[in-house]
Amino acid sequence: MHYITPDLCDAYPELVQVVEPMFANYGGRDSFGGQMVTIKCHEDNSLVKEQVDLPGEGRVLVVDGGGSLRRALLGDMLAEKAAKNGWAGIVVYGCIRDVDVIAQADLGVQALASHPMKTDKRGIGDLNVPVTFGGVTFKPGEYLYADNNGIIVSPQALSMPE
């Protein structure tokens, strides 16, 4: 499904919240959307690795890395695994790496920036907890839609207007 966030904002102004414009689009899909799975972690992508190994079922992984610009929470191997396992997209409040390869993956990816250094793997983080960044609280089970215009969230699934 191709999503256009301005059209969704126009059709559902009472439902959507718009994330502050700070993200760049790095993935092979320029638009994506789905039900959210959330992770809160800091410079440790152990939970990201665990989740992309699971069936994505068209969902979106939202990773709150605390906005850290010191380590990459997603690289090409995890992005390719997420695409293979049916994830619609990944939003990282932090950095990613291997951006040239990720741009070819059948996956939506938005992040703050790229950084070549990988994270430590200490098994630290929280899964499916509400996370807040960009002026919005992302709640597990709610919905996220993203394209080159921005990222929006909604408590319920949205359909593109006719």
Curated annotation (Swiss-Prot):
<keyword id="KW-0456">Lyase</keyword>
<dbReference type="Pfam" id="PF03737">
    <property type="entry name" value="RraA-like"/>
</dbReference>
<keyword id="KW-0479">Metal-binding</keyword>
<dbReference type="InterPro" id="IPR036704">
    <property type="entry name" value="RraA/RraA-like_sf"/>
</dbReference>
<feature type="binding site">
    <location>
        <position position="98"/>
    </location>
    <ligand>
        <name>a divalent metal cation</name>
    </ligand>
</feature>
<dbReference type="InterPro" id="IPR005493">
    <property type="entry name" value="RraA/RraA-like"/>
</dbReference>
<dbReference type="GO" id="GO:0047443">
    <property type="term" value="F:4-hydroxy-4-methyl-2-oxoglutarate aldolase activity"/>
</dbReference>
<feature type="binding site">
    <location>
        <position position="97"/>
    </location>
    <ligand>
        <name>substrate</name>
    </ligand>
</feature>
<dbReference type="GO" id="GO:0051252">
    <property type="term" value="P:regulation of RNA metabolic process"/>
</dbReference>
<comment type="similarity">
    <text>Belongs to the class II aldolase/RraA-like family.</text>
</comment>
<dbReference type="GO" id="GO:0008428">
    <property type="term" value="F:ribonuclease inhibitor activity"/>
</dbReference>
<protein>
    <recommendedName>
        <fullName>Putative 4-hydroxy-4-methyl-2-oxoglutarate aldolase</fullName>
        <ecNumber>4.1.3.17</ecNumber>
        <ecNumber>4.1.1.112</ecNumber>
    </recommendedName>
</protein>
<comment type="function">
    <text>Catalyzes the aldol cleavage of 4-hydroxy-4-methyl-2-oxoglutarate (HMG) into 2 molecules of pyruvate. Also contains a secondary oxaloacetate (OAA) decarboxylase activity due to the common pyruvate enolate transition state formed following C-C bond cleavage in the retro-aldol and decarboxylation reactions.</text>
</comment>
<comment type="subunit">
    <text>Homotrimer.</text>
</comment>
<feature type="binding site">
    <location>
        <begin position="75"/>
        <end position="78"/>
    </location>
    <ligand>
        <name>substrate</name>
    </ligand>
</feature>
<dbReference type="InterPro" id="IPR010203">
    <property type="entry name" value="RraA"/>
</dbReference>
<dbReference type="GO" id="GO:0008948">
    <property type="term" value="F:oxaloacetate decarboxylase activity"/>
</dbReference>
<dbReference type="GO" id="GO:0046872">
    <property type="term" value="F:metal ion binding"/>
</dbReference>
